[in-house]
């Protein structure tokens, strides 16, 4: 159950169990009212937020020296990390607000810190558009966790909201759709008027797993099915639904290519990653992260679907070479042909793979980058050739480069911490 309303932020409904919505004469802006150029950083507003008391002013001049003996403010805690759709930018939700940063070159584009409360657990970008989707979270949420707030940074306020009877787990955006993920249900809305287009029931989905294609025209949406280890693939252009039993264990993570043709999945075991064709559900390739169990934090395809990046709680980011574009289709996941090139190393005992366990005939990662264990990391491919961008929940930012021929350890190109004060950037 969801309700839609225009928002006159900063007065969100303080009751997270409420689904009431006030009527308003204002309408949700059409796409022509938004800045949608994906290659323009100027589409972001530099407007700062006001506090809940609009008449409140500071007694300190901007040119005055810092007041002595003030306690040092500790860095904020990160509640959320996500890349935008083309991995050119990333969003950070903290217990004080949110901030948007550019990957290459690394720089902070803007931040919005709230005076009181401020916890934001979901920040979903729409390429480099001024429109964001926000969900409150943390110990002192800025917005109720059962609401999706549509933020227009050009106006410096929320221009619409979607209310639900349970907490929002995640949000996905396309230029024409808003997808809201709850614990066991997914709602698909039209972007221009927030009209409900479709709803899907899923198995318990506390992580809010959902992926949506970004290609112009037909939309492909992937979400957990109703059974453990099952994924559901919705093809909206052809109005077809495909169910794939991807794993025996529960689904832990998945990712789509931009065009929605390929799907990568990992289970709660975290040892294998499988790549499927979304049209017919066939297994195209299987790669091995390792032999021991791991929690997979992120999967990401390169823009040309030649590489796949995987991050886990083991503190290592792996890059795998994919051969799905060669047309060789895997019918039996236990009989994956090894790639003779250095870009996809496999066991030298591959001649005996019909006899030896599958572990010895597995395809292993081409390149690796080792990080400190204990922090959650997500990874995506950079816009420069053979580069990977890694984000950590501790605020860390790494940009690395891998050798596609020789493989091995990636080289670190740069490191930053996105939680530093704005004067540092």
Curated annotation (Swiss-Prot):
Q: Does the keyword Zinc apply?
A: no
Q: What does this protein do?
A: The PI(3,5)P2 regulatory complex regulates both the synthesis and turnover of phosphatidylinositol 3,5-bisphosphate (PtdIns(3,5)P2). Required for autophagy by autophagosome formation during nutrient deprivation, senescence and under abiotic stresses, including oxidative, high salt and osmotic stress conditions. Cooperates with jasmonate- and WRKY33-mediated signaling pathways in the regulation of plant defense responses to necrotrophic pathogens.
| Gene Ontology cellular component list | cytosol; nucleus; phagophore assembly site membrane; vacuolar membrane
Q: Which domain of life is it from?
A: Eukaryota
Output compositional bias ranges, type Pro residues.
63-76
- Principal location listed in the UniProt entry: cytoplasm
Q: Which GO BP terms apply?
A: autophagy; defense response to fungus; leaf senescence; positive regulation of autophagy; protein transport; response to osmotic stress; response to oxidative stress; response to salt stress
* UniProt biased composition (Low complexity): 1-29, 41-62
Q: Where in the cell? A: Cytoplasm; Nucleus; Preautophagosomal structure membrane; Vacuole membrane
Q: Kindly state the tissue distribution recorded for this protein.
A: Expressed in roots, stems, flowers and leaves.
| Note on domains (UniProt) | The first protein part may form a beta-propeller domain involved in specific binding to phosphatidylinositol 3,5-bisphosphate (PIP2), leading to the association of the protein to the membrane.
Tagged with keyword Protein transport: yes
- Which UniProt keywords are present, listed alphabetically? Autophagy, Cytoplasm, Membrane, Nucleus, Protein transport, Repeat, Transport, Vacuole, WD repeat
Q: How does it assemble?
A: Component of the PI(3,5)P2 regulatory complex at least composed of ATG18, SAC/FIG4, FAB1 and VAC14. Interacts with WRKY33.
* Induction, per UniProt: By sucrose and nitrogen starvation and during senescence. By methyl viologen. By salt and osmotic stress. By necrotrophic fungal pathogen B.cinerea. Up-regulated in response to both water stress and hydrotropic stimulation.
* Name recorded for this polypeptide: Autophagy-related protein 18a
